[in-house]
Amino acid sequence: DVCSSDLAADLSRQVQTKMADKFYYAVTDGVPEQKKGTLEDYLLRDGKTNTSKVVSKSTEGAKAARLNYEVTAQNKTNAVLRIRLDTGRHHQIRVQLANAGIPIVGDAKYNFKEAMTRSGNGLLLCSYKIGFKHPKTHKKMEFEIRNPFLI
């Protein structure tokens, strides 16, 4: 029906225009030096290889990328990070964490440490919370799952 398709279009627009709040958990190969932090980089997407990379601000086509993280659990070799995206770039979390020296466990594309040993894990990255304004009532709505990663 027309009403529900309009609502769906509004939700889609919020996600595409970065108006929706998106949160993730990731298990990293390595532990960040700081328990809380912000990663700010410039990313360039390569459509031919379906990858992105960190580049200098002056690189043609580079786009600003920013995320905030907090360590929620860790052991000697891994950490569980709670991540909030301020921007939503192609493979942003994967690229920025790898560039920071703490790639995601199971990331065959950006975790070059793991490429040598292949853990057999899938990509340990999970969207756990999304928030947006209800298209009709404009009330803030949030949907969340529990942290799926235990270390």
Which role does the model predict for each range below?
Residues D1-I151:
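RNA pseudouridine synthases
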